[in-house]
Amino acid sequence: MSSAQNSDTYRPFSVPQYRQAAPKACALHHLLVLQNAVDELPESLQAFVRDLPRPILLSARSEGFGKHLNTLLYAAPIGSHLYVLGDEAFVWQVHVTAQGAGMLSEEIDLINCGSAQRRVFCVHCGLTQNTPAVAQLNCAGCRVQLGVREHFSKRLGAYMGVCENPDQAYDQVQQGEVQP
């Protein structure tokens, strides 16, 4: 950490920075994906949704959300812009899906407006799991105690979880000491 940075303001470059919700003037089509209902959003985001010209709206609460999301993204015409509103775990899952469908990062706005859920990728077993924003957790896959690093993979849409005690990674698991 340089002398110009202090622990209160330092933020690694890989940790996501989220933009304010604003319609893209150059977009011909506005695709809006919400984790929750519009009326559950803060008033400023409800106003953003109301101000979008003819948005195509998809809620994660709708039946068959995953299938509808893929259909929407693969059928999106040129000039579309995607706005994703939800917690960090949700917005990055949708981001990964959108990029898989061919959208560029410049065509996607992520608006983090949910709980403190985030995705953590275990570098030991490869499981990606949604967790509260904590510094340590036990992997649901391999049960190794992970330290969650302030390194975010945009490709995976997750923070990196690495073994907290690499010299004895599986000792607690073998002894049955790790809590689920």
Locate predicted features.
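FNR/FR-type flavoprotein reductase catalytic core
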Residues: M1-R118
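Cys/His-clustered metal-coordination modules, chiefly Zn-binding fingers
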Residues: V96-P180
